């Protein structure tokens, strides 16, 4: 996105991006109680059928290299895996009430706290710390997490994912229509963005904004251009 925003085809009509993170659960059967967690190493060795099989998968997926591409120098394999319901709810709530710029700041912070520092994503105190670091009122964030708000919307989004045949991540839905599956390189996404940019009309819409109840005024908010953040 930064590449396209930094070098627009038409400087008088630069592209802007609105990002909506759609909740997806790698472990939907995980207990949502905050006391539950296990190390990611244990989770993946179980998933792939043992240490040797996990090592082979790790090598073939080039996770280290892909992580470095998005600013994660080294994945903490012993990070705490837990239910991600609370973190998904928090990101959706911030998107609805503050817009995608603040939501992306919290999302990126949570990625570092989890993948690098090893924190678990159902820790309400940690989640509120991340929200506060982005300027969100900490007490307000905690009150939200202690409520049941946002659960119905996340359930609706899960139904949409099933209907669209999306059963893994990462997946990118661009403009509500173009689906790009897998950990593609940034160059592939740039091609898609440039193709949309060349029309001069922008993307047609969002596939999930209605299901996630994103208000129109928040859908209109965009990420700042590089250098303007």
Residues of each region from the PLM?
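Structural alpha/beta surface segment adjacent to cysteine/selenocysteine redox centers
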Residues: 2-114
């Amino acid at each position: 996105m930064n590449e396209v925003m930094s070098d627009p085809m038409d400087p008088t009509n630069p592209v802007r991006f609105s990002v909506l993170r759609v909740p997806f659960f790698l472990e939907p059967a995980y207990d949502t109680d905050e006391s539950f967690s296990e190390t990611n190493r244990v989770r993946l060795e179980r998933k792939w059928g043992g240490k040797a099989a996990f090592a082979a998968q790790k090598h073939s997926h080039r996770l280290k290299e892909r992580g470095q591409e998005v600013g994660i120098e080294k994945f903490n394999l012993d990070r705490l895996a837990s239910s991600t319901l609370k973190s998904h709810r928090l990101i959706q709530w911030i998107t609805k009430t503050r817009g995608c710029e603040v939501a992306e700041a919290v999302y990126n912070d949570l990625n570092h706290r989890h993948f690098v520092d090893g924190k678990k994503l159902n820790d309400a105190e940690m989640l509120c710390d991340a929200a506060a670091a982005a300027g969100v009122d900490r007490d307000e964030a905690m009150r939200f997490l202690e409520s049941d708000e946002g659960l119905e919307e996340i359930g609706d989004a899960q139904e949409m994912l099933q209907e669209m045949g999306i059963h893994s991540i990462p997946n990118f839905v661009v403009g509500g229509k173009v689906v790009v599956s897998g950990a593609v390189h940034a160059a592939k996404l740039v091609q898609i963005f440039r193709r949309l940019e060349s029309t001069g009309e922008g993307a047609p819409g969002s596939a999930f904004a209605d299901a996630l109840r994103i208000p129109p005024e928040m859908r209109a908010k965009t990420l700042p251009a590089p250098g303007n953040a």
